Amino acid sequence: MAVEGRPPTPKSILRGHKAQVHAATFIRNNERLVTGDADGFVIAWDLTIMRPRAVWQAHDNAILGIAGWGNDRIITHGRDNKLIVWKLIGDDEARMSTTLPLDPCAEPRPKPWILHLLEVNTMNFCSFSYCPVSAPVLPGQQEGQSQDTAQESRFESELLIAVPNTLASEAIDIFHLPSQTRRHTVKLGDKNGMVMAVALFNQADSLTLVAGYENGLAIVAHRDPVKNDWVPLYQATCHSQPILSLSVSPARDFFLTSSADAVIAKHPLPSVVSQDTTSTHATTTQAAQVSESEESSSPVNTGDKAVGKSLLGAALAKEKQNPSSQPKRSLKPEEVLTHPLKTVNTKHAGQQSIEIRSDGLIFATAGWDSKIRVYSTKTLKEVAVLKWHQVGCYAVAFAHIAPNTGAPSINDQNPKATVSTTGTQPATSDSLGHGTQKPNMDQSLTVVPKLVELTVRDKRLRQAKAAHWLAAGSKDGKVSLWDVF
């Protein structure tokens, strides 16, 4: 943590890359930081000891992007026209090399198992984006299982990948994994230049694509499932130079763009206005409202059978249980928006990378002037400047912040309080298995053995997962790791 009145300093400096670092991401609940350089090397850093756990050359050219897929897969995108999905679990790291690219290595470094390989276009210098396949609530879905749970399980097995089109540099291809088939080709204009940055995600039960172009234009488009076409919802040109990076807020209510110029723009993400494709469904909806009013005035259920329920209400209830019988909704957006929410001239040209933290409060940029700048997402005001590197920075990444971690850093927390609130206490359960709590005196006594049982490894792991890491990759091949917010 930075001391008041003194400039912040990095928590750690990770030295190992021989070439400039182009990509970085946190995986496995912040246990690992994965970085990629201009020579195609990938390093998986163990943040409990700040040492490499796996080093291999993933591509024959520069790394454009890295992302984690679940806890056992890593996606890398290189300028050798390849996008590769690697399988790397904890047990696999034991056979991997830990010899850094800086150190000479006589023998070739072993590589993880390749699960999927896509031939893609990398002439744009545009990294990929990914999202889970949309998971609607199925008729056979168990009661109480939320759509988020279904989508999370779908994310473990299926994925959509967005990359620039192989032939037309202004178009975007969307591939499906694991089938490795192309699902969509999206072309949102002819005179915008190359695609420079993309983001793909699900919003309002529809697939949403955000694209930044060479002429400084940013576009948001939704896919209409009925027309099988992409409908623009927003477009604005806020930059005089090519867009270098974009980041979508976790709440899916806005996105940010940075460029080779000094402008940072905050753009809206319009919501989709749904409209039923048939008047029959509209009539059914009105009938459902009438049925609900009838049910509210009907007698209370007695036993296992409802008394006084209308036949229409029973039919509609059955229809609700089978969503597939309802017609698809056509997405009818309103007028295309053309004005950003806010723009700011930072006076610092060339903000290569931009990323919003998972809590949506702040975002950071990596600048060509070697500085990492932190801004407020609400006001776009600069709140911190992190200076350590002597040359330009090309990559920035935030660790995932758990919703219940409100403290600025693990260093400011009381270790005893942490253990007492997060540790399990089986001694406090009664004979029936109910989670009753003992008095405060007994509760304080159970804290001491918990502290003793924690090993050094456990403490480091707890600290690595709870820290609010900010990683920055630079042209000098070094990665600075900060914990300041």
From Swiss-Prot:
Residues 406-431 have a biased composition (Polar residues). Keywords: Chromatin regulator, Nucleus, Repeat, WD repeat. GO terms for biological process: chromatin organization. Residues 273-304, 317-339, 406-440 are annotated as: Disordered. Its main location: nucleus. It is found in: Nucleus. It holds the Pfam family WD40. WD repeats lie at residues 16-55, 58-96, 238-277, 346-385, 451-485. Disulfide bonds: none annotated. InterPro entries: WD40/YVTN_repeat-like_dom_sf, WD40_repeat_CS, WD40_repeat_dom_sf, WD40_rpt. Coiled coil: none annotated. One of its GO terms (cellular component) is nucleus. The keyword Repeat applies. Residues 274-291 have a biased composition (Low complexity). Belongs to the WD repeat ASA1 family. Component of the ASTRA chromatin remodeling machinery complex. Component of the ASTRA complex involved in chromatin remodeling. PANTHER family: GUANINE NUCLEOTIDE-BINDING PROTEIN SUBUNIT BETA-LIKE PROTEIN 1 (PTHR19854:SF1), TRANSDUCIN BETA-LIKE 3 (PTHR19854). This is ASTRA-associated protein 1.
